[in-house]
Design a protein with these regions (language model features):
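Helix-turn-helix
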Residues: 140
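Acetyl-CoA-dependent GNAT
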Residues: 2-105, 114-116, 120, 170-172
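Glycine-rich phosphate-binding loop
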Residues: 108
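Conserved GNAT acetyl-CoA-binding A-motif
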Residues: 121-132
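Residues forming the Rossmann-fold NAD(P)(H) cofactor-binding site
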Residues: 111
Length: 174
């Protein structure tokens, strides 16, 4: 598996890649029903995905990483170099979204992508990583806790003010 950085071309996302990403999002209608990120999770459009990705990339230090296995797009991670709403001294990077093709759930891709993202942060000298999991997503919370993330506080997400649990994982650098 490899991670590829999604790079806009002339300020826009490449059409074929955007179509692939929209297909990935469309497989995850159950997650998007929970999150409320799209008006109709059963009909997510390329234009909606483009707008969502543009919103993610508008933040300083944001990256979209595409996960490919044997050339197939199996997942996506949106990361932030630092949470813009973090308290002073909280310099951990964030995983804003980890999305795996729903037709490939329970095949180890989520764990593999999370590990690759953590490895990128570790290689950059980061000592921890955080994620906020929506309270109405117990499967997501269980996944992240199984990856070694521990709850550190309660919060509201920055987009829609939804209740979340913030988790953190220390990254060993040795």
């Amino acid at each position: 598996m490899i991670l590829q950085l999604l790079v806009p071309v002339d300020g826009a996302l490449p059409g074929p890649v955007l179509t692939e990403i929209a297909a990935l999002y469309s497989t995850n209608h159950a997650f998007f029903e929970l999150s409320g990120d799209f008006p109709d999770p059963d009909r997510i459009t390329v234009e909606q995905v483009a707008a969502s990705l543009a919103d993610e990339l508008a933040h300083d230090g944001a990256e979209i990483l595409l996960a490919r296995s044997a050339g197939r797009l199996v997942g996506l991670a949106a990361t932030l170099d630092r949470n813009p709403a973090a308290a002073p001294g909280d310099d951990d990077p964030w995983i804003g979204l980890l999305l795996i093709d729903a037709t490939a759930h329970r095949e180890g891709y989520g764990r593999a992508v999370a590990t690759l993202v953590e490895d990128r942060f570790r290689a950059a000298g980061r000592t921890g990583v955080q994620i906020a999991v929506l309270d109405n997503n117990p499967k997501g919370l269980a996944f992240w806790q199984s990856q070694g993330y521990s709850p550190v506080r309660r919060a509201k997400d920055r987009e829609l003010g939804r209740d979340c649990t913030v988790l953190r994982k220390p990254l060993d650098t040795a």
